[in-house]
Amino acid sequence: SETDSRKEGRMGQKNAVIRQWCENDCNYAPK
């Protein structure tokens, strides 16, 4: 659904930020 697509988009953005954090502290990296 459209709502699911938006939700996945936000998760994608969050995961991209977490991957950036991983350069400093990989405890934040998604498992």
Swiss-Prot record:
Contains one or more disulfide bonds. Expressed by the venom gland. Keywords: Disulfide bond, Neurotoxin, Secreted, Toxin. The keyword Acetylation does not apply. Its main location: secreted. It is found in: Secreted. GO terms for molecular function: toxin activity. Signal peptide: none annotated. One of its GO terms (cellular component) is extracellular region. Belongs to the scolopendra toxin 1 family. This is Scolopendra 4610.56 Da toxin. It comes from Scolopendra viridicornis nigra (Brazilian giant centipede).
